[in-house]
A protein has these predicted regions:
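Active-site nucleotide/adenylate-binding loops and adjacent lid/helix of ATP-dependent enzymes
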Residues: 2, 11-18, 84-200
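ATP-binding N-terminal substructure of ATP-dependent carboxylate-amine bond-forming enzymes
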Residues: 1-92
Length: 201
């Protein structure tokens, strides 16, 4: 890297989630990344929990200018509020709210990666009947999720559909998914073709 490019890169800040019980420390899940970024960049902290309530609480080093966020996923409306609150303090996140929403929600980014990502269909509904309509004409194994998350930790109960033409099993898995996501369901239902990947490591 040329020296001038290195200096420009060094001017970029980072902002991380703070620990929920000790807001002056970084969330332990991001400790190694925080320490690595701190070698060449100014790093601030903020309380994710306070932001969920609409309040911006900053800790750590003072930052201004272009900043990269590293932390937990946020719903687009929460990210937009975060972006605007930081901007009022002279801190500009590198991704605008529009860019964040586009690549956070599957319908926004899918066309950019079609052919490189598993085939997917989706709707904007929370209704089991509407979800079952998505299965028409589909064959093989699929994964059910919303626009952001699946319930992969409940693989056989609320995520993986071995044969989507099996109406009873498909209903069971999708219905479990909808009921368990509840109010946390983001957008609507997504069905993604299951790809059996090679295991490494």
């Amino acid at each position: 890297m040329r020296l001038e490019n290195f200096e420009i890169a060094k001017s970029i800040n980072f902002i991380f989630c703070s620990h929920p019980l000790n807001k002056k420390n970084v969330d332990e899940n991001y400790l190694e990344e925080y320490q690595a970024a701190g070698l060449n960049h100014t790093c601030a902290l903020f309380s994710f929990e306070d932001l969920e309530n609409g309040k911006l609480s900053l800790y750590g080093e003072d930052i201004k200018g272009v900043t990269i966020y590293r932390g937990w996923m946020m719903p687009p409306h929460m990210y937009e509020n975060f972006y605007n609150l930081l901007l009022e303090k002279g801190i500009q996140l590198i991704n605008s709210p529009k860019e964040y929403a586009k690549y956070h929600l599957l319908p926004g980014w899918y066309s950019d990666f079609e052919g490189l990502t598993p085939f997917s269909v989706w709707n904007e509904s929370r209704d089991i009947g509407d979800a079952l309509e998505l299965t028409e004409g589909l064959e093989g194994a699929f994964v059910v999720k919303d626009y952001v998350k699946s319930r992969k930790h409940e693989w056989y109960d609320a995520c993986f559909i071995k044969d989507i033409s099996d109406r009873e099993e498909t209903f069971r898995v999708i219905n479990n998914f909808l009921n368990r996501q509840g109010e946390n369901l983001e957008g609507g239902v997504v069905l993604r073709k299951f790809e059996s990947l090679k295991s490494i490591g």
